[in-house]
Amino acid sequence: MIELKEKFSIPMPPDEVWPLISDPAVVAACIPGAELTELTPDGAHRGKVTFKFGPTVAVFRGEAKLTYDHPVKRCLIEARGIDQKGASRARARFEVEARGAETTEVTMEGGFEVAGPLEMFASAGGVHVARVLLAEFATNIANVIEQRRATGDDAVLEQAPAASGTKIVGRALLDGARGVIGKVSGKKNEGNK
């Protein structure tokens, strides 16, 4: 299991943010390449996530079960999916929590695993790709809130475009390089004290 613990801020209070990030339709519309297709009788949300890597397209179809604790603004997400064309499988488990006063601090902690042809890519760069997708999600959800504030109603959501592997991998590599440079320069600075 590849572990991921991320925090991001949305410059709005949790009472405005939580109703949106606890709405699966809004969340799917704000994640690049994600789409909800149905709600099953047992409460699972079925959908798909599309990733484009140059000429290769991976479409993971699957379902997610969401368990909410609205008073503390927390949600447990358990998801699984399969890319039938490439025969890769993915599984994830995350806990999401929103806290704060004027700014919402969202913490996402858990892990994911990919088996099959995309396993090596996920192991090598999956965390960086996840960080890029989370950053895009945070930007998109903040934009939705701003639209709703400006119009005074529930603005119609446009689906975020499919996740472009070239764009995401480029940003993920840049993110990874920044992390390495930060660690190296931090160690040098500590040595110069």
Task: Give the residues covered by each predicted segment.
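Beta-strand/loop substructures that line and gate deep hydrophobic ligand-binding cavities in soluble
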Residues: R80-V129
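A conserved amphipathic terminal alpha-helix motif
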Residues: M120-A155
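Glycine-rich portal/gate segments that line the openings of hydrophobic small-molecule binding cavities
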Residues: L39-R80
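Hydrophobic pocket/interface hotspot
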Residues: V17-I21, V27, L66, M108, ...
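Hydrophobic ligand-binding cavity/cleft-lining segments
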Residues: M1-A44, T50, A163-K193
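Intrinsic-disorder/low-complexity, polar/charged segments enriched in Ser/Thr/Lys/Arg/Asp/Glu/Gln
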Residues: M1-K7, A44-R46, V59-R61, R74, ...
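Hydrophobic/aromatic beta-strand elements that line small-molecule binding cavities or substrate pockets
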Residues: E6-F8, A34-E35, R61-Y68, A79, ...
